[in-house]
Amino acid sequence: RLYLFVAIDRTSKFAYAELHPKATRMVARDFLSKLINTVPYVIHTLLTDNGIQFAKRKGTEGYREIPFDRVCRAQGIEHRLTKVCHPWTNGQVERMNRTIKEATVKRYHYQSHDQLKAHLQTFLMAYNFARRLKTLKGLTLYEFICKAWTNTPDRFKINPLQHTVGLNTYIATDEGWLYLAGIKDL
């Protein structure tokens, strides 16, 4: 059994996801730290569900701050929670979860968790760098981010052009290096 952690930018639709064997507070903290290091822009607000890995339980407000909130505070990120029993307030993530499942586990059989993780990363690279969306006026998510950078560079930590994916690209994973055969949009 694996747990899918997904983050999606509400404006650009840029998606980031990881699979983990556990859904603990430490895993959520590490996921957020990796997300912050992955995206080229400054994150100012996060909306999460009320899972124990993201939020304190009722009656524990006086206890120590949870790791996820510590990272948010250190980075100047406002952490908001969805209303309980209102999953539609987090609809973009719910839709992305469905898209990921339809492109992976509902379509293919995997021999191992590593094979699934590698396919998930390949899917996300294709989704973020090659898929054109009507909501972005026909741009890919990456093209939209680059356009935003030219208009408002003060919202970015680094130039998003450094995220360009080309032929024979290798990316680091927890299990080693993953080879991506060019996902350039021609």
Language model feature labels by segment:
Residues 75-77, 98-186:
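C-terminal domain-tail junction helix/linker
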Residues 1-4, 11-121, 125:
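RNase H-like DDE/DDD metal-dependent nuclease/strand-transfer catalytic core used by mobile genetic elements
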